[in-house]
C-alpha cells in the first residue's frame, strides 16, 4: 500500500 507515494518521495529525496 502507498507504493506510489513511497516511490515519489524516494525520487524527491
Curated annotation (Swiss-Prot):
Q: Can the keyword Secreted be found in this entry's annotation?
A: yes
Q: Which GO terms describe its cellular component?
A: extracellular region; membrane; other organism cell membrane
Subcellular localization(s) per the UniProt record: Secreted; Target cell membrane
Whether Cytoplasm counts among this entry's keywords is no
Q: In which tissues is it expressed?
A: Expressed by the venom gland.
Could you tell me the keywords of this UniProt record? Antimicrobial, Membrane, Secreted, Target cell membrane, Target membrane
Q: What else is known?
A: Negative results: does not show antiviral activity.
What does the sequence similarity comment in the record state about its family?
A: Belongs to the non-disulfide-bridged peptide (NDBP) superfamily. Short antimicrobial peptide (group 4) family.
Role played: Amphipathic peptide with antimicrobial activity.
Would you tell me the protein name for this molecule? Peptide Hp1478
Which organism does this record belong to?
Heterometrus petersii (Asian forest scorpion)
